[in-house]
């Protein structure tokens, strides 16, 4: 389009679904000549030049570079955290939109925030600036779909149902039934604490109570707002988003509950209206020092490059940090321990290589040391504290070589290699440069496929010449029973189910990186699916 000045993005590329990862700093600026447009981009309605983002504030905002298939609901969702959205005009042919907020103050907050943290829709950066128009007047007969969606959102914001007879598209929002949200965290590569959830969801209203728990091997939470409208806005804005880059995906639904009964204030549950509640009997899920480290390091306000809550100085600081190249995975790499102590091992069977393979499912193992004077115990050093925590959460209590292993955080900060010339009988191995690390490539799909040990294994990198019977025989030879098998359509991947989780663990240890010929080494991981 003539008159559009090319944007310059500074910093680290950021996907649309990153809530706590690196931000992008941009300088959108445009000088559009007068154009005549309607809701579908045809010649009819005249809008005069939209000069520049840092012009006079207006409650009408001009949004550019929208993806072609973006919906009205997605555009409206951009404004919901900042206040009531009162009008919208989609310019489909121009990949642009005008969004009107109820107040100029809300619009200023929105522009300031998105100037520091570039918004994305469908993995595409978009640009938001003030419009020269102080009010958005649209012909509803030409903009019926957008108006229907807006009416639905307005109905939710006022806690009423939509107007009778109003047709709302399938992508439009529906009235909230409950102030309680049910949240499931998929691909939970990094731990998610109660405090992290509180800070993320507090952007949309007062969070009263949170209860976290694990069900069906998935971390879940129930979160209660004071107002159903806040729950609706949070669901609309956050469902499907990632807390961290490429992992920890939020799946949000309304709960059938309308009120949560919280008995204890601890790291699993919290009633923010009752600070007097006891912490409860028993040990917390995390050691208090570790929990504090996670709360500090993963805090939305504390992470350089994080998408902060709606506090503009913090958002600006985040963007500046991203531009300075200081963006990285938030976590406890600074304060958390990277070394695990694994005990109750089968000392007749266990080797550094077998521990490397199993613990390598949950992080990049750097070093392994089986203790010389206590060979049923080992120290395992992971790449960072998040990985050690993840491995501990998933592997503590699992059966390996017939024994239930115990995994705890070690007091050691590193695993020492034996002195040069000293023979430690192969009990210590350095895997720092191993080509088998699953997570050394940033953004790897492996981040999205981390699941607890299960009887079902995911197999990949299968050459065309290998048949189902070949793989069944191969896995049966590990000492277990193959219960089911299913090839994916391209035959490069498959699911294989063993009789027990212990058998699946054994098969993974034995066959991950197995040479199938034709320069194909088998990749094995745990699956959340069943056959």
Swiss-Prot record:
One of its GO terms (cellular component) is growth cone. Its main location: nucleus. It is found in: Nucleus. The modification Phosphoserine is found at residues 26-27, 308. SMART domains: RRM. One of its GO terms (biological process) is cerebellum development. RNA-binding protein which binds to intronic polypyrimidine tracts and mediates negative regulation of exons splicing. May antagonize in a tissue-specific manner the ability of NOVA1 to activate exon selection. In addition to its function in pre-mRNA splicing, plays also a role in the regulation of translation. Monomer. Interacts with NOVA1; the interaction is direct. Identified in a mRNP complex, at least composed of DHX9, DDX3X, ELAVL1, HNRNPU, IGF2BP1, ILF3, PABPC1, PCBP2, PTBP2, STAU1, STAU2, SYNCRIP and YBX1. Part of a ternary complex containing KHSRP and HNRPH1. Interacts with NOVA2; the interaction is direct. This is Polypyrimidine tract-binding protein 2. It comes from Homo sapiens (Human). The gene is PTBP2.
């Amino acid at each position: 389009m003539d008159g559009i000045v090319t944007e310059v993005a500074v910093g680290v590329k950021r996907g649309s679904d990153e809530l706590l990862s690196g931000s992008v700093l941009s300088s959108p600026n445009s000088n559009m000549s007068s154009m005549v447009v309607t809701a579908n981009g045809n010649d009819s309605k005249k809008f005069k030049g939209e000069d520049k983002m840092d012009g006079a504030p207006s409650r009408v905002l001009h949004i550019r570079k929208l993806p072609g298939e973006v919906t009205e609901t997605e555009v409206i969702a951009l404004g919901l955290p900042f206040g009531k959205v009162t009008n919208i005009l989609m310019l489909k042919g121009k990949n642009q939109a005008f969004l009107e907020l109820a107040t100029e103050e809300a619009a200023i907050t929105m522009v300031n925030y998105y100037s520091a943290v570039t918004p994305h829709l469908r993995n595409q950066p978009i640009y938001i600036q003030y419009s020269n128009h102080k009010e958005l007047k649209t012909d509803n007969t030409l903009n019926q779909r957008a108006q229907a969606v807006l009416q639905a959102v307005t109905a939710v914001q006022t806690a009423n149902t939509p107007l009778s007879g109003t047709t709302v598209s399938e992508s439009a929002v529906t009235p909230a039934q409950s102030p309680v949200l049910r949240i499931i965290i998929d691909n939970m590569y990094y731990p998610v604490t109660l405090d992290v959830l509180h800070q993320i969801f507090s952007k949309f209203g007062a969070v009263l109570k949170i209860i976290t728990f694990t069900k069906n091997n998935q971390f879940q939470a129930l979160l209660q707002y004071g107002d159903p409208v806040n729950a609706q806005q949070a669901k609309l804005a956050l469902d499907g988003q990632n807390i961290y880059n490429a992992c920890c995906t939020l799946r949000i639904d309304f709960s059938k509950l309308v009120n949560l009964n919280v008995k204890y204030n601890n790291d699993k549950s919290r009633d923010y209206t009752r600070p007097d509640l006891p912490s409860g009997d028993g040990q917390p899920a995390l050691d208090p020092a570790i929990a504090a480290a996670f709360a500090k390091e993963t805090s939305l306000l504390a992470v350089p490059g994080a998408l902060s809550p709606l506090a503009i100085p913090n958002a600006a600081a985040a963007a500046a940090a991203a531009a300075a190249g200081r963006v990285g995975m938030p976590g406890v790499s600074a304060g958390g321990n990277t070394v695990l102590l694994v005990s109750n091992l089968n000392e007749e069977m266990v080797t550094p290589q077998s521990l490397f393979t199993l613990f390598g499912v949950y992080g990049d193992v750097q070093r392994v040391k089986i203790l010389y004077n206590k060979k049923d115990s080992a120290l395992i050093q992971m790449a960072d504290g998040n990985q050690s925590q993840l491995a501990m959460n998933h592997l503590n209590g699992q059966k390996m070589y017939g024994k239930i292993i115990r995994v705890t955080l070690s007091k050691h900060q590193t695993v020492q290699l034996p002195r040069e010339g000293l023979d430690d009988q192969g009990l210590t191995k350095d895997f720092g440069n191993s080509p088998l690390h699953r997570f050394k490539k940033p953004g790897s799909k492996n981040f999205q496929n981390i699941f607890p040990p299960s009887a079902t294994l995911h197999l990949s990198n299968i050459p065309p010449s290998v048949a189902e019977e070949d793989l069944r025989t191969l896995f049966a030879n590990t000492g277990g029973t193959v219960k089911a098998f299913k090839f994916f359509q391209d035959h490069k991947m498959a699911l294989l189910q063993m009789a027990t989780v212990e058998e699946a663990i054994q098969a993974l240890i034995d066959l991950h990186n197995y040479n199938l010929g034709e320069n194909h080494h088998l990749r094995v991981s745990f699956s959340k699916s069943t056959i």
